[in-house]
Amino acid sequence: MLIDSYGRVVDYLRVSVTERCNFRCRYCMPDEPFKDAGHSNVLSYEEMFEFIKICLDNGVKKIRLTGGEPLVRKGVENFVAMINGYKSGLDLAMTTNGYFLAKKAQALKDAGLKRINISLDTLDKTKAHFIARKDVLDNVIEGIETACNLGFGVKINTVALKSVNDNELIYLMDFAKEKGAQIRYIEFMENSHASSELQGLNKDQILDIISKKYNIKEITKSPNSPSSLFELEDGYKFGIIDPHKHDFCSTCNRLRLSAEGLLIPCLYYEDGKSIREAMRAGDIKKACEILNQVLADKPEKNKWENDGKGEISSRAFYQTGG
């Protein structure tokens, strides 16, 4: 069992299989040309898998594959099958922008993927182009529909932005309800790579918009979940991730592994420790030592103060795996 210095059980590993992404979303990617880590610096699937096995053997129960955009890396469905084949009953999930999902969903399902979180910030093609800096909406919608039809557990992630999609939040919920997916509204999280003109909506503002159509009640959430959970009168549940006022640091159960092998204890933590050389040398003992050191270094609370003006990591979310 993996336990940090504050007695929190860590049983959730987020693995960024690549920092590359085919979108350049304004709330995530920098304006300047993207420079990735380089092929030689990225862990192979086999190297990632060997580290994942260490974690699974020590009590990790949930693996989420992220990016960048995980579906731009070739062979990711084979990687899913490797992980799924190692431990039965594993909660194996992926976060994706959905662009390539329609083509790859069946292979991912066959490989053992259970759940998919898909980004959808608007149902308007012009706005989608503005946010992602390319035409993406048709592909994303097709990906969502395919995933829902195949029986994946689907969540739709929507970053709530003032003067961008604030007039669509109800429409997006209705879309998610129709598809049988849960929507989660995400407060815009300031980071050094986001466009400076963006402004987000907070939880109260989001609820105020939704309540114009629906009666809402807050319900008990999982203690490890980053989102507040709400229910409509018809039983439909939706979430709001509101780190500005309600972090979940006291129950945080996760570590993050970047594509280049950096093991990171917190999304807003600048530093981590690299397992790359240990994994390439096949030095499992050394990898375990690094894992234990990162557990010991896991902070009690993130460095981002509740007013959003605290120290913000210069590591972009696309590098850490959001």
UniProtKB/Swiss-Prot annotation:
This is GTP 3',8-cyclase. Keywords: 4Fe-4S, GTP-binding, Iron, Iron-sulfur, Lyase, Metal-binding, Molybdenum cofactor biosynthesis, Nucleotide-binding, S-adenosyl-L-methionine. Pfam families: Fer4_12 (PF13353), Mob_synth_C (PF06463), Radical_SAM (PF04055). Pathway: Cofactor biosynthesis; molybdopterin biosynthesis. Its EC number is 4.1.99.22. S-adenosyl-L-methionine binds at residues 27, 68, 119, 189. Catalyzes the cyclization of GTP to (8S)-3',8-cyclo-7,8-dihydroguanosine 5'-triphosphate. Signal peptide: none annotated. Its cofactor is [4Fe-4S] cluster. [4Fe-4S] cluster 2 binds at residues 249, 252, 266. Binds 2 [4Fe-4S] clusters. Binds 1 [4Fe-4S] cluster coordinated with 3 cysteines and an exchangeable S-adenosyl-L-methionine and 1 [4Fe-4S] cluster coordinated with 3 cysteines and the GTP-derived substrate. It comes from the Bacteria. PANTHER family: MOLYBDENUM COFACTOR BIOSYNTHESIS PROTEIN 1, MOLYBDOPTERIN COFACTOR SYNTHESIS PROTEIN A. It catalyses: GTP + AH2 + S-adenosyl-L-methionine = (8S)-3',8-cyclo-7,8-dihydroguanosine 5'-triphosphate + 5'-deoxyadenosine + L-methionine + A + H(+). Residues 5-217 form the Radical SAM core domain. The keyword Iron-sulfur applies. GO terms for biological process: Mo-molybdopterin cofactor biosynthetic process. Belongs to the radical SAM superfamily. MoaA family.
